[in-house]
Swiss-Prot record:
This is Putative methyltransferase cpaM. One of its GO terms (molecular function) is methyltransferase activity. Belongs to the methyltransferase superfamily. One of its GO terms (biological process) is methylation. Keywords: Methyltransferase, S-adenosyl-L-methionine, Transferase. Putative methyltransferase; part of the gene cluster that mediates the biosynthesis of the fungal neurotoxin cyclopiazonic acid (CPA), a nanomolar inhibitor of Ca(2+)-ATPase with a unique pentacyclic indole tetramic acid scaffold. The hybrid two module polyketide synthase-nonribosomal peptide synthetase (PKS-NRPS) cpaS incorporates acetyl-CoA, malonyl-CoA, and tryptophan (Trp) and utilizes a C-terminal redox-incompetent reductase domain to make and release the tryptophan tetramic acid, cyclo-acetoacetyl-L-tryptophan (c-AATrp), as the first intermediate in the pathway. It is an enzyme of class 2 (transferase). It comes from the Eukaryota. The keyword Transferase applies. It comes from Aspergillus oryzae (Yellow koji mold). Its EC number is 2.1.1.-. Disruption phenotype: Has no significant effect on the synthesis of 2-oxocyclopiazonic acid, cyclopiazonic acid (CPA) and their biosynthetic intermediates.
Length: 434
């Protein structure tokens, strides 16, 4: 994708942006170009950006003064009116009783809920992001010396912070970040919070800050550290999730998903015979014997349910839940006999984020080493909406998440493609908790 990085500037020429996504994301995945928006000619600058035909944009317009709050809010509204797709919205404002536009908001707390004396003067940052149609928040960080980005109180880019591990403060901060994310419709947000008092009332005061993720000096900010440590796949997976979530929420993949479901509905009567005696069936047999799948299993792209049947036939005591885009594929005796109810029908990337925890997650037949000829043949046979990809570079870039170990990574012949007369290869991969 071609992604624009939008930075607000005063009229004088200033130095380069401190944000550098190309340090984290390979150019083979996405291309980034920085566009500076002048405060005095913002609308003209945005009109020029529209001609650059970016697929999406990241909004890094930093508020540096009280006047900038209204300026950035107005520019953001103009961006949205021009149908520029923004991956984040760092400017959530509301009007105070005094008629001022502000980014600050308050959450009342009761004195007995927190040890107030220990928390006075402290400041915390919490990152939150969209995950499909759901949302998640990261571990909050408490700074030893903190300043915030609006220069009323500038927070430093230093990683000199400690993790907030104790409740109820941790839960309060994460809940606040999720509330701000929901209100901003923002893709991802970073919220700075502090403890404040007014008369007899105590409250957490929150400030929506411009996220400092993807900084030029790698892992020099809270955001970059927490993404690297807590988000499997790191910054690349984080950005891809933001893009995917935006696409899901916009509904732009609806036609593709419906088309794909129809393709597999038509294939369903022939699937069992096509799968028999293939590398796929042998791989699933081997996996069910060689690794522990006991407990609860989430089977993504479960198809006709033969993996769940294979587990049970090999004596595995597992409750298997399935997700598949094709209702026709799931009308099988394997599903009836081996899968929990309800079975979920729909795109797995949309449904998975709302699922409870499972002991194991299985994803079948998506890690494929596909040739260009195969990809083009699938489009010719099933239409442009039936897209396929070679996933090898994605696997390599994903790596091994923190706290996990890769116990299996094996390339094997998946099946024979009769249309092209070639063998399609795939990868069997397994991660386990370290």
């Amino acid at each position: 994708m071609k992604i624009g990085l939008l930075v607000l500037r005063g009229d004088p020429v200033e130095g380069p942006s401190v944000v550098d996504l190309s340090s984290y994301i390979p150019p083979s995945r996405h291309q980034f170009e920085t566009r500076y928006i002048s405060k005095s000619e913002a609308e003209a600058g945005i009109d020029r950006i529209c001609k650059d035909e970016f697929d999406m944009c990241l909004n890094y317009m930093t508020v540096e003064s009280c006047d900038d709050v209204s300026t950035v809010a107005a520019i953001t509204r103009y961006l949205e009116a021009k149908d520029i797709t923004l991956l984040n919205s760092p400017c959530l404002t509301h009007i105070t009783d005094a008629g001022e536009e502000t980014r600050r908001f308050r959450i009342p707390i009761k004195a007995h809920e927190l040890n107030l004396e220990d928390l006075r003067g402290k400041k915390w940052l919490t990152l939150a992001m969209d995950m499909g149609r759901e949302a998640m928040s990261f571990s909050p960080g408490q700074f030893t010396s903190s300043m915030c980005l609006d220069q009323e109180d500038l927070h430093s880019t230093s990683t000199d912070f400690t993790w907030v591990t104790e409740d109820p403060l941790k839960s309060m901060l994460r809940s606040m970040a999720l509330d701000v994310l929901k209100a901003s419709s923002g893709g991802f947000v970073c919220v700075e919070a502090s403890l404040q008092a007014q008369a007899d009332s105590m409250y957490l005061e929150g400030l929506l800050c411009t996220p400092r993720a993807f900084y030029r000096e790698k892992h020099s900010t809270y955001e970059d550290v927490v993404i690297e440590q807590e988000f499997p796949g790191g910054h690349l997976a984080f950005l891809d999730m933001l893009i995917t979530s935006k696409q899901i929420r916009s509904g732009q993949d609806h036609a593709r998903n419906q088309h794909l479901a129809g393709v597999y509905d038509s294939f369903a009567p022939r699937y069992h015979a096509a799968r028999a005696n293939t590398g796929l069936s042998r791989m699933q047999e081997d996996m069910s014997r060689d690794y522990d799948f006991s407990g609860t299993v989430l089977d993504l792209a479960c198809g006709n349910g033969e993996f769940g049947a294979t587990l049970h036939e090999n004596g595995v005591s597992a409750k298997v839940t399935g997700i598949d885009v094709s209702e026709g594929m799931t009308r099988s005796s394997y599903i009836q006999d081996h899968y929990e109810r309800p079975l979920l029908i729909g795109p797995m990337d949309e449904l998975i984020m709302g699922m409870p925890e499972f002991d194991h997650v299985s994803v079948t037949a998506i890690h494929e080493d596909l040739s260009d000829a195969y990809i083009e043949d699938m489009k010719k046979r099933n239409g442009e909406l039936c897209s396929n990809f070679n996933h090898i570079s994605t696997l390599e870039e994903f790596g091994v998440p923190n706290g996990w170990q890769q116990v299996l990574m094996q390339r094997f012949p998946l099946y024979e493609n009769p249309n092209l007369g070639e063998t399609v290869y795939g990868f069997a991969i397994r991660f386990e908790r370290a």
